[in-house]
């Protein structure tokens, strides 16, 4: 066992050769490297699989022995300063390593087909492998300096991946927005690290916690300064995990390829903030105000993310706001001191959200056969609907992921979310009411996304391809109200390419992508419908290839069974609570005397309540959306609900207010744009003016005046020495007279 721990340092470095070799290959042997590009995908999966096996081995040893292993090397040694590098293997490290590697492998396999059309295929896999290296380095770090180094590497990789299609202006703006927003949090993190080093004199976690606890117990620190440093540390987690108020970058991050969204939202970038708070929880616990602040930020994010997801048309943006809300649940649990519940929900949410994103990618991939490469069309749920019979495997997988996120048993997120909801009653009834209400909102918007995407009719076919007036049938509303107004104001259905109707796609179509031809023939940076290998043009979407469906099906298994890891089956001497063994010793401020057993009566009572709330949200979604999509024969029923009356007008005002709030992102982006972005630009323009006209103007003006004076003097002189002597004595006499009169 000791030998296994000694070689754990290779965990973050195993995926690193792939991006290095790809870079060297493209530099020195570009043609050969591109022609063998699938070999690099295989190597990426292989190396990450080795890391996964190594991580599983470490986790088994963690479960059996509950040991913590740390190894350090002295890097800088001075009289009063020393800096060590090393790695730390504990339950948190092993959990995060398995999470990163399993989700990462599924995303890499999926990406081989999803990105096969793109000429940036090799660059994509290089970024992905470097992303995995950065995140694995972050979770194995043994001190705050290493945390910060890998924290910045994670940010850089995410910046490159969000802006992967950098020639699209919207993608370039999205990665800039993510970069700038995270700079705010990262600067706070750096200041917090320096502040705690000034207090304790150490960057190492083991020394930092011990010294700080001693200082607190002896009342030898300034609590105001300590709280400020803790808030600055937490600011890094707020930005990275898209917590309010630094959440604005997350929806725009959907401009990257869909596999990137799956990895960022499931196991890497946004999970980094949760990991940081979990790692530093022993530090935060002894500062009561910071724990309250963490829980407050968490509950605000929970509710805000859910409300902003209510009216999204873009399927990926809807999932992004869902991620924001679920991360809020994790942050709330950490703020309450419920360490186990937070990590449990991190695990279950990662697999469920990866499943949903890969499922949405499969839907987008199939929709592109109809609308071409245009994210505003292929990701628009208004143009979807009726996909059940065309993509049945994707539909079933997405449905299971939806039910999991809604908290329906026995799927994964039910078990973890229920723990957080139950613990919230012990912490604060107000927070509990908000958290439980948001569970209903989660069920509503997730079910809404499912219905808009898969149920009813394929809405894109309600267009008149001849260019004549559209059909008189009702338009489909994203929000569930009369569609004509909304459709005209917020979106317009697209005019499609002419499609043949004699072709149908099989559910498992065996399409072979010719890599060499793709590399040479792709002259545009983005996917175009003409570059699909299919010789037939489909008038309906078709199911994705096996290489895309395989990771989705594996994630379905995780979604079905990973929740059982955390069920505390500790009855009658049978101890099957694997997660509690894994996390021993665990921190739980709400159940200090708990032995992790469960009162099944209380559990069932709470479960019935939570499932009832989720079921109510699902029912409302079906009530608003299902009748519209079921059949045109229900028009009389629909019309009965749209009769104008006082109650209807009042209801519409409320509904429109909620819609405007959600569709406009809570006006937070507009506020930042008006008061921060515009203000900063005006300040920059003023600084530019002051620098050029005042700072540079003074020395330039002096130089210019000297030049003109010299020119005047030069023109006066005629080259005669007698003239020079005359002017010299004249100036001397003038200055002597001035001195004489002013002196006396």
Curated annotation (Swiss-Prot):
Pfam family, one: Proton_antipo_N
Keyword Disulfide bond attached: no
Keywords annotated in UniProt: Chloroplast, Membrane, NAD, NADP, Plastid, Plastoquinone, Quinone, Thylakoid, Translocase, Transmembrane, Transmembrane helix, Transport
Top-rank taxon, per record: Eukaryota
Catalytic activity: a plastoquinone + NADH + (n+1) H(+)(in) = a plastoquinol + NAD(+) + n H(+)(out); a plastoquinone + NADPH + (n+1) H(+)(in) = a plastoquinol + NADP(+) + n H(+)(out)
Membrane topology: Multi-pass membrane protein
Residues spanning the membrane: 9-29, 40-60, 89-109, 125-145, 147-167, 185-205, 219-239, 258-278, 290-312, 327-347, 354-374, 396-416, 425-445, 549-569, 608-628, 724-744
One GO CC term on file: chloroplast thylakoid membrane
GO biological process, one term: ATP synthesis coupled electron transport
Gene3D superfamilies reported in the protein's UniProt record: 1.20.5.2700
Keyword NAD: yes
EC number assigned by the record: 7.1.1.-
Compartments where found: Plastid, Chloroplast thylakoid membrane
One MF annotation (Gene Ontology) recorded for this entry: quinone binding
Self-association state and partner proteins as the record states: NDH is composed of at least 16 different subunits, 5 of which are encoded in the nucleus.
Similarity field: Belongs to the complex I subunit 5 family.
Record's function text: NDH shuttles electrons from NAD(P)H:plastoquinone, via FMN and iron-sulfur (Fe-S) centers, to quinones in the photosynthetic chain and possibly in a chloroplast respiratory chain. The immediate electron acceptor for the enzyme in this species is believed to be plastoquinone. Couples the redox reaction to proton translocation, and thus conserves the redox energy in a proton gradient.
Protein's recorded name: NAD(P)H-quinone oxidoreductase subunit 5, chloroplastic
Species of the source: Gerbera jamesonii
Gene name per UniProt: ndhF
């Amino acid at each position: 066992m000791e030998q296994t721990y000694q070689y754990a340092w290779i965990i973050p470095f195993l995926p690193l050769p792939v991006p290095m070799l790809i870079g060297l290959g493209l530099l020195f042997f570009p043609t050969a490297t591109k022609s063998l590009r699938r070999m690099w995908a295989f190597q990426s999966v292989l190396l990450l699989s080795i890391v996964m096996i190594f991580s599983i081995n470490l986790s088994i040893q963690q479960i059996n022995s509950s040991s913590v292993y740390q190894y350090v090397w002295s890097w800088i040694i001075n009289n009063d300063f020393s800096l060590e590098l090393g790695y730390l293997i504990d339950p948190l490290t092993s959990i995060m390593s398995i999470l990163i590697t399993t989700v990462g492998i599924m995303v890499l396999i999926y990406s081989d087909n999803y990105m096969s059309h793109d000429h940036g295929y090799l660059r994509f896999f290089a970024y992905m492998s470097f992303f995995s290296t950065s995140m694995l380095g972050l979770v194995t770090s043994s001190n705050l300096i290493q945390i910060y180094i890998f924290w910045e590497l994670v940010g850089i990789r995410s910046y490159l991946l969000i802006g992967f299609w950098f020639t699209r202006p919207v993608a370039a703006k999205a990665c800039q927005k993510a970069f700038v927003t995270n700079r705010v949090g990262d600067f706070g993190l750096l200041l917090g690290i320096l502040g705690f080093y000034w207090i304790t004199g150490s960057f190492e976690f083991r020394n930092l916690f011990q010294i700080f606890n001693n200082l607190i117990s002896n009342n030898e620190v300034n609590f105001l300064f300590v709280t400020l440093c803790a808030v600055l540390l937490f600011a890094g987690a707020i930005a990275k995990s898209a917590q309010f108020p630094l959440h604005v970058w997350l929806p725009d991050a959907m401009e990257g390829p869909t596999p990137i969204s799956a990895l960022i939202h499931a196991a890497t970038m946004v999970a980094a903030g949760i990991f940081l708070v979990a790692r530093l929880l022993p530090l935060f616990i002894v500062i009561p105000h910071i724990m309250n602040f963490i829980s407050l930020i968490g509950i605000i994010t929970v509710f805000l993310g859910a409300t902003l997801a209510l009216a999204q048309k873009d399927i990926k943006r809807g999932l992004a706001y869902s991620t924001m809300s679920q991360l809020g649940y994790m942050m709330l649990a950490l703020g309450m001191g419920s360490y186990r519940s937070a990590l449990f929900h991190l695990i279950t949410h990662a697999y469920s959200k990866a499943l949903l994103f890969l499922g949405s990618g499969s839907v987008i991939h199939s929709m592109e056969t109809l609308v071409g490469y245009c994210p505003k069309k292929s990701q628009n749920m208004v143009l979807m609907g009726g996909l059940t019979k065309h993509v049945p495997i994707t539909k079933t997988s997405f449905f299971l992921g939806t039910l999991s996120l809604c908290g329906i048993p026995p799927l994964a997120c039910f078990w973890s979310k229920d723990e957080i909801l139950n613990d919230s009653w012990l912490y604060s009834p107000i927070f509990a009411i908000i958290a439980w209400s948001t569970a209903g909102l989660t069920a509503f918007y997730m079910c809404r996304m499912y219905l808009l995407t898969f149920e009813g009719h394929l809405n894109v076919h309600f267009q008149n391809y001849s260019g004549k007036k559209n059909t008189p049938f009702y338009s489909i509303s994203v929000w569930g109200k009369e569609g004509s107004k909304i459709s005209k104001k917020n979106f317009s259905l697209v005019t499609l390419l002419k499609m043949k109707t004699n072709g149908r796609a099989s559910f498992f179509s065996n399409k072979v992508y010719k890599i060499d031809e793709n590399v040479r023939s792709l002259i545009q940076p983005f996917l175009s419908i003409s570059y699909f290998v299919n010789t037939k043009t489909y008038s309906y979407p078709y199911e994705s290839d096996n290489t895309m469906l395989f990771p989705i099906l594996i994630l379905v298994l995780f979604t079905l069974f990973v929740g059982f890891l955390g069920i505390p089956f500790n009855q009658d001497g049978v101890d099957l609570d694997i997660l509690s063994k894994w996390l021993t010793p665990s921190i739980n401020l709400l159940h200090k005397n708990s032995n992790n057993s469960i009162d099944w009566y209380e559990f069932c009572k709470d479960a019935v309540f939570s499932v009832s709330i989720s079921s109510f949200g699902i029912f409302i979604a079906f009530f608003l959306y299902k009748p519209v999509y079921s059949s045109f024969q229900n028009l009389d029923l629909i019309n009965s609900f749209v009769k104008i009356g006082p109650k209807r007008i009042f209801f519409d005002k409320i509904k429109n207010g909620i819609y405007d709030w959600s569709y406009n992102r809570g006006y937070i982006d507009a506020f930042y744009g008006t008061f921060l972005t515009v203000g900063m630009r005006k300040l920059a323009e003023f600084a530019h003016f002051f620098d050029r006209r005042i700072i540079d103007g003074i020395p330039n003006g002096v130089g210019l005046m000297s030049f003109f004076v010299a020119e005047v003097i030069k023109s006066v002189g005629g080259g005669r020495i007698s003239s020079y002597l005359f002017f010299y004595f004249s100036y001397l006499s003038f200055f002597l007279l001035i001195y004489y009169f002013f002196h006396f």
